[in-house]
Amino acid sequence: MIFVTVGNHFQGFERLLEKVDEIAPRLSHEIVVQRGYSKYVPKNTNHFDFVPANTAMEYIRNADLVISHAGMGTLILCKEYGIPIIIFPRREKFKEHVNDHQMEIAQVLEKREDPNIHIVYEENQLEEKIMEAVGRREIAPLENRGRENLVRTITEFIKTCHG
């Protein structure tokens, strides 16, 4: 199963949802989409607006691949569970976010060259990246050390972003 999540930001992310819906018939995996506040309603995928956090975590845990905005919560869960993730950052110029901090996050992640983290900046790159990433787990899941592990991961990432 491929799980697509756009998070809970108040601006929609139509660009991602429309592209996923377009390529869904060509993929062999079931696709489940969390739409958030997006207005676009997919025709070729299962979808919902929001679910409780524990339900979203289960979707991520059971996914062969996650496609997401550059949200830290989703990224950390994918790292913890060893799930490949495609990051498709929201862009200010498309009115998907109030600034381009997600582009900055994606650029930092791209430099880390983690084989389970794939970065896509343009819609036309998405299908090829899905084919490369689906079912690919090159890194064992991180040990779950609870809150301390989460805090350490976030702290290390922030230090990386700000030099």
Could you describe each region identified by the protein language model?
Residues 1-163:
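Nucleotide-activated sugar donor-binding and catalytic core shared by glycosyltransferases
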